[in-house]
A protein has these predicted regions:
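Glycine-rich phosphate-binding loops of nucleotide-dependent enzymes
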Residues: 1-283
């Protein structure tokens, strides 16, 4: 996490495209300056401006979910066009709730209401996301088979058109979308999984810490795409172990021991509040 770098480093050197773009004492950086240097743009200012844009005052409910361990009646609530963050220490129920919501989309579950199709972007793409023997185009199209069929068979043309659209839209760097998915870098593999989710009919996208270990350039591109799709009405539930990613969210639910222990608006969000909620006596 960037916070660990800022706390522990004596000196910070930022490289981009093989060149040193800034080098200074760690004390001269805050998170804003570091993210800006890594992304090559006023990244956080852009985030703040885009999220501050007016949203509809009343949006339809997309998800209402209560963790199994929750005894006080607190629900996670997400409406159309919202980006909802799930925070807290890893392994405290965030992934469990996302998987329960994903399952509830096809089978009713007590304590969970889902009103639109759901897609999941897994954090462990190797074991939970990628079809290793398939091409990039096939990996993207698997969630959209109904639209890609021509009779009983998949139309290669429709599959190629879908893949080409998302290659351009999300910036998947490859000379040929028919190449095997493992020909891509890790960041581009993750982009392909986002393309799979966003190219489908899903109006609810569950993100299970999908940007862990991904380079900052890819992260910033995905952040832009998530905000763009949210502005069009898609709902995102975003679990992340990286506090700075929560700047993209409208509301943040903090988890501890399988329960929601805090609900913060984005303008209330600080790393200190998340830490206090994660370690405090609220649960």
């Amino acid at each position: 996490m960037l916070g660990e770098v800022l706390r522990n480093a004596d000196r910070i050197v930022v490289m981009r495209d093989g060149k040193v773009v800034v080098a200074d004492a760690a004390s001269a950086f805050d998170r804003d300056r570091l993210v800006t240097a890594m992304g090559g743009a006023e990244a956080r200012q852009k985030i703040a401006a885009q999220i501050a844009a007016a949203k509809p005052s009343a949006s339809p409910l997309r998800v209402r979910a209560r963790p199994a361990a929750q005894k006080d009646g607190t629900d996670l609530v997400a409406c159309a066009g919202e980006i909802i963050g799930l925070a807290g220490l890893a392994g405290h129920g965030q992934t469990d709730l996302l998987l329960a919501i994903f399952a509830a989309a096809s089978r009713a579950r007590t304590g969970i209401e889902v009103t639109a199709p759901v897609a999941l972007v897994a954090g462990d793409r190797q074991s939970d996301g990628i079809f290793p023997q398939w091409s990039i185009a096939q990996n993207i199209g698997i969630r959209s088979l109904a639209r890609l069929r021509n009779g009983l068979l998949i139309s290669p043309q429709r599959e190629a058109e879908l893949a080409a659209f998302w290659q351009k839209k999300i910036g998947i760097r490859t000379p040929d979308m028919n190449n095997n998915i493992f020909s891509l870098s890790g960041g581009n593999q993750q982009k392909a999984l986002f393309a799979r989710a966003l190219g489908s009919d899903a109006q609810i996208v569950l993100m299970d810490d999908p940007m862990r270990g991904v380079d900052i350039g890819t992260k910033l591109e995905v952040y832009d795409l998530v905000r763009e799709e949210a502005a069009r009405g898609r709902t995102f539930l975003w679990y992340t172990t990286e506090t700075e990613e929560l700047d993209n969210c409208d509301h943040i639910y903090v988890f501890k021991n399988g329960r929601i222990v805090a609900n913060l608006r984005r303008d209330e969000l600080t790393e200190e509040k998340i830490i206090q909620s994660s370690f405090g006596d609220a649960a």
